[in-house]
A protein has these predicted regions:
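N-terminal short leaders/motifs
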Residues: 1-12, 123-135
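Structured N-terminal alpha/beta-domain signature
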Residues: 2-5, 13-21, 65-67, 86-93, ...
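Secondary-structure boundary elements
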Residues: 70-129, 148, 254, 258-266, ...
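Hydrophobic/aromatic-rich core segments of domains that either
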Residues: 139-230
Length: 280
């Protein structure tokens, strides 16, 4: 018997989870995240063969139903080092004269887009410009926003570079959401860097395509009736629950089986889509 932990995607301003289909019969238990109340499923079964899980999404209503700004205070979100020196802003980042966009732009200037950088697994200031992937960039950005006293949330999920049936997403993607004075903004600094933008712009999908969020927060801790599971850095793809209690990430491939209907602004995905994830 093998156990896998699979998240229940949240409802956000841009998406509403309509339905979720799992292979039947497949016994499961529902577990909840300790800080945010997010829900996940512990499935038990024979996973030696690939299994398909389908997620059906509709457009978001603009009203956020989940506590996306729940404060995850842990090693993945606390900044080590001097914030002011790192951002190199004329005034402290917490000053009223700075918008969230100033902090986002200051962090973006510290990065070039590249592969994963193991030196940036935990948020810390550094000198010069470093190469990193979306996780590295958003780890620093989230920690800087928190250190500046701003409301910020980290989302992990999937990005499909083309909005058509058959489009695949073999890896995960992540982005940041801020909210100040009632203004909510989505930030994908990694894609802005890839696009060669001189300054990050607010909004989803600056490179086009569509995305789906599968969790929010860093260092998620799910609890069963008998135990607390180890903290999960970010949760987009399913995890194996091994006998030693560890939660390694599963190998998956996601397929967009129906295109999302989008309006004139392709940064905001809408309507209904179906995602099928194959676990290896």
């Amino acid at each position: 018997m093998i156990i896998t932990l699979r998240t229940d995607p949240p409802d956000t301003a841009h998406q509403t989870l309509v339905g979720f289909c799992a292979p039947c019969p497949l016994p499961y238990r529902i577990v909840r995240e300790s800080q945010s109340g997010q829900r996940a499923y512990l499935f038990e079964g024979d996973f030696r063969a690939s299994l398909e899980f389908s997620f059906h999404f509709a457009a978001g209503t603009g009203t956020v139903k989940t506590d996306e700004f729940a404060d995850f205070d842990n090693a993945y979100t606390r900044l080590a080092g001097d914030l002011s020196e790192f951002l190199a802003l004329e005034r402290p980042a917490c000053a009223a004269g700075h918008g969230d966009d100033d902090i986002v732009a200051a962090v973006a200037r510290r990065f070039s887009y590249g592969g994963p950088n193991p030196d940036l697994a935990r948020p810390a200031t550094f000198c010069g410009v470093r190469s990193g992937n979306c996780i590295d960039i958003n780890t620093a950005l989230l920690a800087c926003l928190r250190a500046a006293g701003r409301r910020a949330a980290y989302f992990a999920g999937l990005h499909f570079d083309q909005n058509r049936a058959g489009s695949r997403a073999d890896g995960m993607h992540c982005w940041i959401v801020t909210e100040t004075a009632g203004r909510r903004c989505d930030w994908d600094v990694a894609h802005c860097l890839i696009a060669g933008l001189a300054r990050p712009v607010a909004g989803l999908n600056p490179l086009g395509g569509v995305r789906a969020a599968f969790s929010h927060g860093r260092g998620l801790v799910f609890e069963t009736a008998k135990a607390r599971l180890p903290a999960i850095s970010h949760f987009a793809r399913p995890r194996w629950l091994l006998a030693d209690g560890s939660l390694p990430e599963a190998a998956t491939s996601a397929v967009l089986t129906r295109p999302m209907q989008t309006g004139a602004d392709s940064r905001h995905p809408a309507q209904t889509a179906t995602l099928v994830t194959r676990s290896a």
